[in-house]
């Protein structure tokens, strides 16, 4: 079985908690290696053919600071042939004009470098105005809102993982 690399950035701890839940649902640390992007380097990405990328949207539609610091280094990674799933944490009420933008920014960059995006997620059940993470009517990955819909996180993660697990493990 192919081991999966899960790279996340976190400011308040929410994205790390979600990453741990995803790792558990995927089958634990024997299936998924978790790495805080603040501790990662480009070589860490190179050892995986399947990736899960997690980033909260920070401030007004910006990348979380550790992802912002790593962003230019993404250019040094060959994503061709890599399957990449995304998840993000955001606030759809307080930041309705840029809900999940960070997830969209990372997906656009990585897909532009050859990554194959998997794990699109429906926009139904959310109330926002705009998002850079929406393509063809769906989020480019799992959109979570710990501020306004924390009670939906566990079910959303379980549902999403059940969809991406067979794709990432094939």
UniProtKB/Swiss-Prot annotation:
Residue ranges crossing the lipid bilayer per the database entry: none
PROSITE patterns: FLAVODOXIN (PS00201), FLAVODOXIN_LIKE (PS50902)
A GO molecular-function annotation: electron transfer activity
UniProt key word Electron transport: yes
Pfam family, one: Flavodoxin_1
Domain Flavodoxin-like: residue ranges: 4-165
Alphabetical UniProt keywords: Electron transport, Flavoprotein, FMN, Transport
This protein's record includes keyword Flavoprotein: yes
Top-level taxon of origin: Bacteria
Cofactors that this protein relies on: FMN
Function summary: Low-potential electron donor to a number of redox enzymes.
Family in the record: Belongs to the flavodoxin family.
Protein name, per record: Flavodoxin
Lineage: Bacteria, Bacillati, Cyanobacteriota, Cyanophyceae, Synechococcales
């Amino acid at each position: 079985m192919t081991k999966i690399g899960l790279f996340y950035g976190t400011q308040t701890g929410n994205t790390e908690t979600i990453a741990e839940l995803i790792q558990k649902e995927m089958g634990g640390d024997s299936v998924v290696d978790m790495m805080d992007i603040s501790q990662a380097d480009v070589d860490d990405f190179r050892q995986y053919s399947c990736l899960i990328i997690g980033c909260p949207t920070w401030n007004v539609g910006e990348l979380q600071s550790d992802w912002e610091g790593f962003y230019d280094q993404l250019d040094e990674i060959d994503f061709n042939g890599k399957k990449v799933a995304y998840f993000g944490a955001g606030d759809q009420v307080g930041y309705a004009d840029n809900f999940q933008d960070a997830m969209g920014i990372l997906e656009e960059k990585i897909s532009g470098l050859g990554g194959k995006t998997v794990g699109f997620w429906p926009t139904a059940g959310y109330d926002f105005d705009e998002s850079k993470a929406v393509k063809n009517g769906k989020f480019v990955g799992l959109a979570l809102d710990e501020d306004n819909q924390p009670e939906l996180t566990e079910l959303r993660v379980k549902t999403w993982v059940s969809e991406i697990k067979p794709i990432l493990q094939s």
